[in-house]
Amino acid sequence: MTDQNHDTQADDDANDAPATDFSNQFLIAMPQMVEGSLAGSVIYVCEHTTRGALGLVINRPTDLTLESLFERIDLTLEIRPVKDSPVFFGGPVQTDRGFVLHAPAGDYSSSIKLGDLALTTSRDVLQAVADGNGPARMLVTLGYAGWGAGQLESEMAQNAWLTVGADADIIFDVPPEDRYPAALKLLGIDPVMLSGGAGHA
């Protein structure tokens, strides 16, 4: 895990794909293996290339609400219950920058398309939400989790993370406190039985 900045622009070069691509997968932190701010985290991997990886923690709500965040950027959000939704801790990199993971993907000025989802970093998606015509489902974070070239692969080799194909329902519909066990259940794992000695799927 690194605190270095990561370019969020998708690269069209097919040669940039890593041997094992973890894009559109969940990383589930293994007990005793992942420490610090990412302990106990479920991370949705938005982009993974030979240059590194970018993901968002999806199970760490903060005390900041969307209404408060919108006020900071001079937008008014009056839609309930959206305005009371929490902003999430997305990771330790660029914690002053907002990231919006949403569905449907829509057409915004700075987005990475992820199948039916998109990661948008431009203000226009928040303006659309304020206007009442934003994406139907979204998760807003401050910060992201970033890895340099080969770092994620190294952590996987050390069994720091379990991996499983991402489920949008867990991202958007499951209560934050239940997302870690829900992600484990995708692998058929009971959280109570999980130990630090297992490998990745």
Curated annotation (Swiss-Prot):
InterPro entries listed in its UniProt record: AlgH-like
Single GO cellular component term: cytosol
Family: Belongs to the UPF0301 (AlgH) family.
Matching PANTHER family: UNCHARACTERIZED PROTEIN YQGE, UPF0301 PROTEIN YQGE
Name of the featured protein: UPF0301 protein Bpet0561
